[in-house]
Amino acid sequence: MNGTEGPFFYIPMVNTTGIVRSPYEYPQYYLVNPAAYAALGAYMFFLILTGFPINFLTLYVTLEHKKLRTALNLILLNLAVADLFMVFGGFTTTMYTSMHGYFVLGRLGCNVEGFFATLGGEIALWSLVVLAVERWVVVCKPISNFRFTENHAIMGVAFSWIMAATCAVPPLVGWSRYIPEGMQCSCGVDYYTRAEGFNNESFVIYMFIVHFLAPLIVIFFCYGRLLCAVKEAAAAQQESETTQRAEREVTRMVIIMVIGFLTSWLPYASVAWYIFTHQGTEFGPLFMTIPAFFAKSSALYNPMIYICMNKQFRHCMITTLCCGKNPFEEEEGASTTKTEASSVSSSSVSPA
């Protein structure tokens, strides 16, 4: 094994020189330059500084403006809550531990940080799945006369929490475990060892299939069908400028959504699966650290993609920030009027 395994930790370095120490008790500066820990702390501070305001603003603006309190926006609010879970449960902890160079909060802190980071990420992921299914059902109409109501939204929120819990809770009760990973300043599921009594192998396979491949397939299917529906509508009205504009908007939105999903989760899932299937292979601490924080940074660009690109929300947000006035109101109104004139309007094919 090209690493050192101890009680509830795995260090990606062979302890031939005797310098490897527990990441709960000693600084891990022998793994990487101390400057890397400072950079990690700075990056976490940046995510807190940007992720908290934009997600809090999402909650505040939605609660302030009655016209935003729609059934679908409950899912978007759930997404913002999930991102705030990651900010407070994961980013603040990682920033604090990186300042010390090791997981100074101990085993209990590792469980708490790993749980909240996993829970927040999974709630966000399954919220995106619910959004994709909702857009597919509403726009493509596989179920005739279907109307997305508040009850459907509540069920979608409950579904996202249940699915997130089925991923975040098991490591707390003995099916796998949370251990420090990468530079040993944040905690995640144990992909690294086959520790006796934890059944890591079965949990990782379960998590990869149910909590990565399944959401990926659903999102691709739903937005693929959505794009086809918009193209068919545009073909039926080839001379309609507003329809063609709606198609371009949806195409751009779908591309951004897919890229956002893949950028967040594909690197992390791929590296985790590689480590799991190649246990004993030599790799450095940055090998897992970098993709892990690609996934965590989704707390910043999730609301930018799924909420700030919504015209109605953007209008309300500007109104709130400008003390009740929108200096761009005439331009926003004209754009909205043009889009609503289309039989395939942006309100039907955008995330909200």
UniProtKB/Swiss-Prot annotation:
It comes from Pomatoschistus minutus (Sand goby). One of its GO terms (molecular function) is G protein-coupled photoreceptor activity. InterPro entries: GPCR_opsins, GPCR_Rhodpsn, GPCR_Rhodpsn_7TM, Opsin, Retinal_BS, Rhodopsin, Rhodopsin_N. The record marks 113 as: Plays an important role in the conformation switch to the active conformation. Residues 342-352 have a biased composition (Low complexity). It comes from the Eukaryota. Photoreceptor required for image-forming vision at low light intensity. While most salt water fish species use retinal as chromophore, most freshwater fish use 3-dehydroretinal, or a mixture of retinal and 3-dehydroretinal. Light-induced isomerization of 11-cis to all-trans retinal triggers a conformational change that activates signaling via G-proteins. Subsequent receptor phosphorylation mediates displacement of the bound G-protein alpha subunit by arrestin and terminates signaling. Glycans are attached at residues 2, 15. A lipid is attached at residues 322-323 (S-palmitoyl cysteine). It is a multi-pass membrane protein. Gene3D superfamilies: Rhodopsin 7-helix transmembrane proteins. Residues 1-36, 97-110, 174-202, 275-286 are extracellular. One of its GO terms (cellular component) is photoreceptor disc membrane. A motif ('Ionic lock' involved in activated form stabilization) lies at residues 134-136. Residues 331-352 are annotated as: Disordered. The modification N6-(retinylidene)lysine is found at residue 296. The keyword Nuclease does not apply. The keyword Glycoprotein applies. The chain crosses the membrane at residues 37-61, 74-96, 111-133, 153-173, 203-224, 253-274, 287-308. Residues 62-73, 134-152, 225-252, 309-352 are cytoplasmic. This is Rhodopsin. Phosphorylated on some or all of the serine and threonine residues present in the C-terminal region. GO terms for biological process: absorption of visible light; G protein-coupled opsin signaling pathway; visual perception. It is found in: Membrane; Cell projection, Cilium, Photoreceptor outer segment. Keywords: Cell projection, Chromophore, Disulfide bond, G-protein coupled receptor, Glycoprotein, Lipoprotein, Membrane, Palmitate, Phosphoprotein, Photoreceptor protein, Receptor, Retinal protein, Sensory transduction, Transducer, Transmembrane, Transmembrane helix, Vision. Belongs to the G-protein coupled receptor 1 family. Opsin subfamily.
